[in-house]
Amino acid sequence: MIISKKSLPRRTFLRGVGATVALPLLDAMVPSMTALAQTPAAPVRRLGFVYIPMGSDISRWTPPGESGALTALSSTLSPLEPVMKHVTILSNMELRNAYPGTHATSNAAFLSAAKAKWTESSDYYLGTTVDQIAAQQMGQETQLPSLELSMDLMEVVGQCDNGYACVYQNNLSWSSPTTPLPSEAHPRVVFERLFGEGGSSADRRKALGKRASLLDWVREDIARLQKQLGSADRSKMTEYLDTVREVERRIEKAEAQTFDNPLPDLDRPVGVPAAYEDHAKLMFDLQVLALQGDITRVITFQLARETSNRSYPEIGVADPHHPTSHHGGDPEKVAKIAKINQFHVSLFAYFLEKLKAVPEGNGTLLDNALYLYGSGMGNPNIHNHVDLPIVVAGGAAGRVRAGRHIKYSEPAPLANLHLTMLDAVGVRLESFQDSTGKIDTLYSPVGLAG
């Protein structure tokens, strides 16, 4: 793409008292008569990770056939049908440093590929996770180096699982072997991290009481910038701001029950949607906004916590997840686990379709992103860490070839995938934990130079 016009800086913001709104990539951000790929406005690569707890029923997860083009999906993965050409399924991946087979080590090793120190005290020790290795390089140019999200309040401390400290299953991201990064489950807090600026709890309390929109604080900047843009960019900016407002309204709806009561401390606001699906979709939509506005390029999201006793009555599973996962081969319980697995996949598919719907440069936001979806546990009934449920989605701006099934005859280290994903987004490492090499079949045949 070559655009002939004056350009705006890629990092253009709408600013007002208490708000800063980053903008998506606009045509006006491309310098006159310059190829898009040769400008600071060239589409950037994003890296994300979504964790699901307690493995899967792998018999209903694995696609039919051997390695090659992904031509059919399993029942559990069927929600990915609309984006099938954008995903790759990897079968027979192993997380060797997650043994001796606990929930805590499953979560801890998923992004670190490291062995957690066995302790229930504060002398915990793990390893820097792959997302934080990426953030050290990819986060230098963004408002937030990385964004850590979850669906559960991580307030349990002490010993959680077989003598392992709760910190191991509470936190996906570690910026160093001794520094876990807490995640955020409150949509309002995430929204304010992305778009809020300054202001005290009292200021936000006053704004909430008036049902004021954050966009009201940047109206003057919106009007000023609209005059500088062409019609296509005006439409793109309006659509983006409409999405910001729509997400804000959904947060307000969840908070509505608090308006008739004394407001709590807004440094830790309540207002999480009552329905799990609504909450998850809201958290995914916040990720879309964060990536589209280039607020961050690295995200982790824990869809549920290991040992979660959450039930899913909306899909006909009233029994708690964790006890059900110890199914003992009971066909009824196995079917319930498969239902939960498919439900979680459907939420990820929702997110991928949202990314696919956002045009960016010569492609879409999904084309420029690279996401790993999966678990650190394989079979939850026996707590093993082989044949993990793993999906890779996106194209990393042309570096990754999707629409494939990669099936190993012998277990392959998950660290190989981490190493490959880092390489695909431009972060070069010789090795990562127990990696034995990169996954060449994941790369685009176009090549990875640059």
Q: Where in the sequence are the language-model features?
A:
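Ligand-binding pockets and gating/stacking loops
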Residues: 1-450
